Regions:
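C-terminal beta-sandwich/jelly-roll accessory domains of carbohydrate-active enzymes
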Residues: 338, 353-425
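Short, well-ordered beta-strand segments enriched in hydrophobic/aromatic residues
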Residues: 344-353
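Chitinase-like catalytic core of GlcNAc-active glycosidases
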Residues: 43-45, 80-197
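Substrate-binding cleft of secreted/luminal carbohydrate-active enzymes
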Residues: 248-327
């Protein structure tokens, strides 16, 4: 084994360092500091904002705000809507609940993307809205314009923003919602230059194969967007699912995401798909973009605030776990329990343990010999070489701690204790 060199050699090295005015100890310390500085620090978590998109502030909304106030930096609150018929609707928040959070508020004005002439919009009304909101004991940080216009109309949108910015209180920031579809437009840079901040929306209904959120595509959009703006910006990420019906012509016939809808020519005649934002997928995406540290990216805006009454959003517990970057643990099991009314009839249920809403399993199987069965709530009866099973026909999430009935079994000739069901991925 080597002893690290002879004594004369070590003396020659020390003499050379001394001649240069460098002590061996200083050299060692320099090397250590270089190695330490070369180690990358863990990325700082991006701050969490959230959209309150509910038009009616029900007890479930105010309760969700109260339970989430410690995890949210800024609330983006739907304040007004201008629809395609040129009607103007104001939303009335629960001011006491909003003020109690002590968090900054961004008032969002949604302008229908089909409005072609923005010069007719009452800018004075938006300015007055900002003044009115400041009278309710909240900290109004910004006005956000949500206008999903066609790329060909960005120049007109830019002129509208310039006029609004000139009339808005300089202490209030002007921010906009930006779309990935705009990234190829030469008018985008000018548009973003007239806004103090922007929120890039990377979730949308595009086609059933892509789903509601594509992390690879979203990350590419973020990298490209960072090259177009010199102002701070955030990314909007989904906490919800949506049911989309596609017509025979391949176009979207109906979307059910914020509340149930009955469409006479939609769900009955088209092909429906349940598109779901998976908590594990979104959580992994957040970890990735925090490592990317893209220029100007200052936070996440979650769309939308989950509530106990919102069946199409994550549970509050799952959302908080994602907000705090906690490990997500999904655990779904199945059980069969005998009906109290009919001997031999067993109800089949899924039970979600863990701390996160979990994707519905693809197959539920039983080894019992049953005469009949059927599925409900996203499941249907099917058969394969191994026998009877309940197969998932619509994807979805089962909230943490919740139970869902998915079907029944009629097994009259079987010992009740031997009827069991199991989950197959």
């Amino acid at each position: 084994m080597s002893d690290g060199g002879s004594a004369p050699a070590r003396r020659r090295v020390c003499s050379a360092l001394a001649a240069c005015g460098v002590s061996p100890l200083a050299l060692v310390l320099t090397l250590i500091l270089t190695l330490v500085s070369g180690c990358s620090k863990p990325p700082a978590p991006l701050p969490n904002d959230a959209y309150i998109w509910q038009r009616k502030w029900t007890p479930s909304v105010t309760s969700a705000i109260a339970q989430s106030s410690g995890f949210v930096q800024t609330w983006h609150v739907l304040a007004a809507e201008k629809d395609s018929k040129d009607d103007w609707t104001l939303i009335s928040p629960d001011w006491a609940t909003l003020a109690a959070t002590r968090a900054p508020v961004t008032a969002v004005v949604r302008i229908d993307g089909q409005l072609g002439d923005l010069t007719t919009l009452p800018i004075a009304r938006i300015v007055k809205l900002a003044d009115d909101w400041k009278q309710h004991g909240i900290t109004l940080a910004a006005i956000e314009i949500d206008h999903d216009c066609a790329t060909s109309r960005l120049a007109g949108y830019t002129r509208f923003l310039a006029t609004l910015r000139a009339q808005l209180d300089p202490a209030i920031k002007l921010t906009i919602t930006a779309l990935p579809a705009w990234l190829g437009s030469p008018a985008l840079d000018a548009l973003l230059a007239h806004a103090d901040e922007a929120v890039l929306q990377v979730h949308a209904v595009m086609n059933p194969a892509q789903g509601l959120f594509d992390p690879t595509q979203a990350r590419a959009w973020l990298r490209e967007f960072a090259q177009h703006t010199k102002h701070p910006w955030r990314v909007a990420l989904p906490t919800y699912g949506t049911r989309v019906t596609w017509g025979d012509d391949g176009r979207v016939a109906g979307i059910e995401s914020e509340r149930p809808m009955l469409l006479a020519n939609g769900f009955a005649q088209g092909v429906a798909h349940e598109l779901v934002a998976q908590p594990e997928q979104i959580s992994a995406f957040v970890t990735r973009i925090e490592r990317d540290a893209l220029p100007g990216l200052t936070g996440i805006v979650w769309f939308r605030l989950p509530t106990d009454a919102d069946d199409r959003a994550w549970s509050l517990g799952t959302w908080r776990a994602v907000l705090t970057r906690a490990p997500l643990i999904a655990a779904i099991s199945a059980d069969a329990h005998q009906s109290a009314q009919q001997p031999g009839l067993f109800d089949v249920s899924l039970v979600s343990g863990g701390n996160t809403d979990a994707p519905l399993p693809a197959v539920i199987r039983t080894d019992a010999s049953c005469e009949a069965a059927d599925g409900i709530n996203g499941y249907a009866l099917d058969y394969d070489a191994h026998g009877m099973l309940l197969r998932r026909v619509q994807p979805g999430l089962l909230r943490a701690g919740m139970r869902r009935d998915i079907g029944w079994l009629r097994c009259g000739g079987v010992d009740n204790k031997k009827v069991s069901v199991r989950v197959e991925p």
